[in-house]
Amino acid sequence: MTHEPLVQFQNVQLGYGRQVVLQNVQLDIFRGDFFGLVGPNGSGKTTLLRCLLGILKPLRGQVARAEGLRIGYVPQREMLDPLFPLTALDIVLMGRYPHAGIFRSPRRNDRELAMQCLEQVGLADSAHKLYRELSGGQRQRVLIARALAVEPNLLVLDEPTNGLDLPTEAAILGFIERLHQHDGLTIVLVSHVLNVVARYASRMGVLLDGRLLVGDAEQLIQEQVLEEAYGVPVCVQRLDHHYLVAVREVERADGDG
């Protein structure tokens, strides 16, 4: 990680109309970061993500983006009508639209790059299979390939392992980690699953009562912070340089069934 900021939130207030969701957001995403954003459902993760992507404007404050910033975005799920006979390659080619334009046919170099992205995620052999016929893990890899086709310097993933089985989840997260470590790609990983972010992120943000707490994982993966954010007693353990977070069992009073 360098100290070159790709995105800077400066005293930002976010919300919808008169409803304020987050306030006084101070956040720098640096080149080479692996930044994890966590918080319970309804805490404002989607709102902050929409602002990061440029979809939602701040109510107050400023969001500064580095010149030449290209964001590849992997959504939770792709809402495609199953009647559309789109192949995996068709989906990945969508990532070329910012470069080529929506109404222009993909050029040879666009197709070559899309195939390279599919190969990168291990799905070159499935390029011409219908997207709707792929497994959940394969679909997620296709969405990552589409984001890589943007040729991003910042990759944003929203709940990338939601609904996947454990082996597929581990494979997807391992691939994301390799993109960061070997390719030097800056990562923002959004998840409600603490253990996912705790294992991979070097810096993180925790959403708490309309505020964003930012720091190193070691600073924020503390029982007091997480209990306040999630409203349940937790236990934090560190194993092999990784954190394990679990809900603490509460002793029942005598006579409770």
Please report, for each region that a protein language model flagged, where it lies by residue.
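Helix-to-loop junction immediately C-terminal to a conserved catalytic motif
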Residues: 53
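ABC ATPase nucleotide-binding domains
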Residues: 229-257
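Conserved ABC ATPase "signature" region
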Residues: 93, 108-126
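Conserved ABC ATPase signature
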Residues: 130-134, 138
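H-loop/switch region of ABC-family ATPase nucleotide-binding domains
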Residues: 191-192
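Catalytic Walker B motif of ABC-type/P-loop ATPase nucleotide-binding domains
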Residues: 155-159
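Conserved catalytic motifs of ABC-family nucleotide-binding domains
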Residues: 151
